[in-house]
Regions:
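Polar/acidic, low-complexity leader/linker segments enriched in S/T/G and N/D
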Residues: 1-16
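Short, surface-exposed beta-strand/loop "edge" segments at domain boundaries and coil↔beta transitions
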Residues: 10-13, 41-45, 55-57, 82-86, ...
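Short beta-strand-centered interaction patches in the first periplasmic/extracellular domains
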Residues: 63-84, 120-200
Length: 272
């Protein structure tokens, strides 16, 4: 059973009769859902589907008629984290801080009317140098989160949170292990897919300058046949002003972060 809400969180009704539901969580980006059910007037774009403490916004509705004369709807959308896809970084943003604080600052400084708040920091460590102009807010924080192995989420309470998942693999002993097996009767079948079509592991990042004077750094050290190269134009990472110049070392660090973000987005894709 799912509750449907208006964009202002006014409850509109319940969905109890549906044919199928896929509710897909994502760690470092917005999750998505797909719902197939008989059509009703609650299923319109921008309405919100609540599933416990999680919620998603309806972004697509496809209506079809059946041979039996019924009307079915395929409803798709993304979790409320996707609201951040509606904003860009408005101007220049340059910070040297933890990945957590940088993501929180990107969101806080670019809400511009979005009905979201930002949770207090949890103190995750690891400082990075970051600079961007006019990037998409969701794309930027997703890249930082993936590079830093952090999760991002916006629940039904419309609070943006940065979190870190628990390692439940068999190779560790700190947390209870999660084991899926037919022997435990907690899985009926399985599917594994690996995709390397867009995979890159070495990136040449270009900063300020022209020709032989352009600032260039390389991120990644693969060699031979395993080496997969790409280029990123990072001219938006500047050298500051005459009054407040950015050191060459800091520019290199910012370019390195941009390269790490790129490689995080282009890593080998595995799904289970």
């Amino acid at each position: 059973m799912f509750t449907i809400y208006a964009p202002d969180l006014t409850p509109l009704g319940l969905i109890e009769n549906y044919r199928s539901m896929q509710w897909t969580r994502r760690y470092s980006k917005a999750g998505q859902f797909e719902l197939h059910l008989p059509m009703n007037n609650l299923l319109v774009p921008e309405n919100i589907v609540r599933n416990g403490n999680e919620a998603a916004v309806i972004e697509s509705v496809t209506i079809t008629s059946t041979m039996e004369g019924g009307i079915m709807a395929a409803v798709r959308g993304r979790f409320l984290t996707s609201y951040l896809d509606r904003r860009i970084i408005w101007g220049l943003m340059a910070m040297s801080d933890t990945a957590e604080n940088i993501m929180r600052s990107i969101v806080t400084n670019n809400l511009r009317g979005l009905p979201l708040t930002v949770a207090e920091p949890l103190g995750y460590t690891g400082t990075i140098d970051y600079q961007n102009s006019y990037g998409n807010v969701l794309a930027e924080i997703a890249a930082i989160a993936e590079m830093s192995e952090l999760g991002i989420a916006v629940g039904f309470d419309r609070v943006f949170r940065v979190y870190k998942g628990l390692d439940r693999t068999a190779s560790q002993s700190s947390n209870p292990r999660a084991v899926f097996s037919r022997n435990f009767e907690n899985v009926l079948g399985s599917e594994y897919a690996v995709e390397m079509l867009n995979h890159k592991n070495v990136v040449l990042v270009g900063g300020q300058g022209e020709g032989v004077d352009r600032m260039l750094i390389t991120v990644g050290n693969e060699t031979g046949l395993n080496r997969r190269e790409t280029f990123v134009d990072a001219r938006d990472i500047g050298n500051g002003t005459a009054e407040e110049p950015i050191s060459v070392a800091t520019q290199h660090a910012m370019l390195a972060v941009r390269g790490q973000q790129t490689l995080a987005e282009l890593k080998v894709s595995e799904s289970f």
